[in-house]
Amino acid sequence: MAGIVVRSESAVAVMGAGAWGTALAKVLIDAGGPEAGVVLWARRPDVAERINTTRCNRAYLPGTLLPPGIRATADPADALRGASTVLLGVPAQRMRANLERWGGLVADGATLVSLAKGIELGTLMRMSQVIVSVTGVDPAQVAVLSGPNLASEIAQCQPAATVIACSDLGRAVALQRMLSSGYFRPYTNSDVVGTEIGGVCKNVIALACGMAAGVGFGENTAATIITRGLAEIIRLGMALGAQVTTLAGLAGVGDLVATCTSPHSRNRSLGERLGRGEIMQSILHGMDGSDGGDGYVVEGVTSCASVLALASSYDVEMPLTDAVHRVCHKGLSVEKAMALLLGRSTKSE
């Protein structure tokens, strides 16, 4: 994609060296990069050290050689020093705790970009709301990046697009220019609510698609789940003030299709294992690093609870989300969940 490369004079901080944070650090450099470089914060010092010495993040994005211009650190003060743009790539349920620890390290006037897709348990806040609540920044300083963005594919420079949502168009355009490359195309949007809701809910629907595949159901079932899942997402989004066009775009349908159909999707993969009869706690034990591995988060497992609670507070019906929640947290079998969904009273589409 041809375009003008706009270089930022100050460094960009990417807080979170998981697969997505690492992939976006690479995108920033490939797009022309800030003159001061990209600083990638890793929670674990050994991960930061390996990135700096090998130019690879073997723990979370194996097989990808990171370009010069990315420097990793385990010191949040080091990462945030002088950064006018901060990409927040920590898990949704840890966003608040991390922001509280980082305290006054964020520069005044900095643009804060949420990469996390979740609703906070308890408060039922979206991530942009959590960021404003903890930091006290103007909501116009907060942007959300979301779309059909599987980190492993983007790290391989496969063509992809995303949405940058912010109420401040100037900030959105600045981020768009900063991230535009020959393989990564951002679109701007002012609908922060819709962009976030699409990103959160698609993880829950992807769990359902995985469950169906694990049981042995085919493409008709998958298409039904995706389509009816989209109906749930639109109902909740509209209740919260989202625009239907956002949910019909990259941050809605696009993200939903990618996550529900890709073998690289953590949420779909976990759902598939549940459909094959594996036990939730055993699966999570192998994913969270407690078995000695590097560990990663499957947001949909938590999101199904917070999304369901949020929907209930707005009197929005979400039967698929409810079924996923029952399987993940109430011990319902996938087969019984499917039977309950199919046994619901008939209605018009």
From Swiss-Prot:
Any one GO biological process: glycerol-3-phosphate catabolic process
Positions annotated to bind sn-glycerol 3-phosphate: K117, G147, K202, D255, S265, R266, N267
E.C. designation(s): 1.1.1.94
Active site: K202 (proton acceptor)
Swiss-Prot/TrEMBL keywords: Cytoplasm, Lipid biosynthesis, Lipid metabolism, NAD, NADP, Nucleotide-binding, Oxidoreductase, Phospholipid biosynthesis, Phospholipid metabolism
Residues the entry annotates as binding NADPH: W20, R43, R44, K117, A151, R266, V297, E299
A Pfam family of this chain: NAD_Gly3P_dh_C
Reactions that this protein is recorded to catalyse: sn-glycerol 3-phosphate + NAD(+) = dihydroxyacetone phosphate + NADH + H(+); sn-glycerol 3-phosphate + NADP(+) = dihydroxyacetone phosphate + NADPH + H(+)
Compartments where located: Cytoplasm
Pathway: Membrane lipid metabolism; glycerophospholipid metabolism
Gene3D superfamilies assigned: N-(1-d-carboxylethyl)-l-norvaline Dehydrogenase, domain 2, NAD(P)-binding Rossmann-like Domain
Signal peptide: none
GO CC, alphabetical: cytosol
Keyword Acetylation part of the UniProt annotation: no
Highest taxon in the source lineage: Bacteria
GO molecular function: glycerol-3-phosphate dehydrogenase [NAD(P)+] activity; NAD binding
InterPro entries: 6-PGluconate_DH-like_C_sf (IPR008927), 6PGD_dom2 (IPR013328), G3P_DH_NAD-dep (IPR006168), G3P_DH_NAD-dep_C (IPR006109), G3P_DH_NAD-dep_N (IPR011128), NAD(P)-bd_dom_sf (IPR036291)
Known role: Catalyzes the reduction of the glycolytic intermediate dihydroxyacetone phosphate (DHAP) to sn-glycerol 3-phosphate (G3P), the key precursor for phospholipid synthesis.
NCBIfam families: PRK00094.1-2, PRK00094.1-4
HAMAP family, alphabetized: NAD_Glyc3P_dehydrog (MF_00394)
Family to which the UniProt record says this protein belongs: Belongs to the NAD-dependent glycerol-3-phosphate dehydrogenase family.
Identification of the protein by name: Glycerol-3-phosphate dehydrogenase [NAD(P)+]
Organism: Mycobacterium leprae (strain TN)
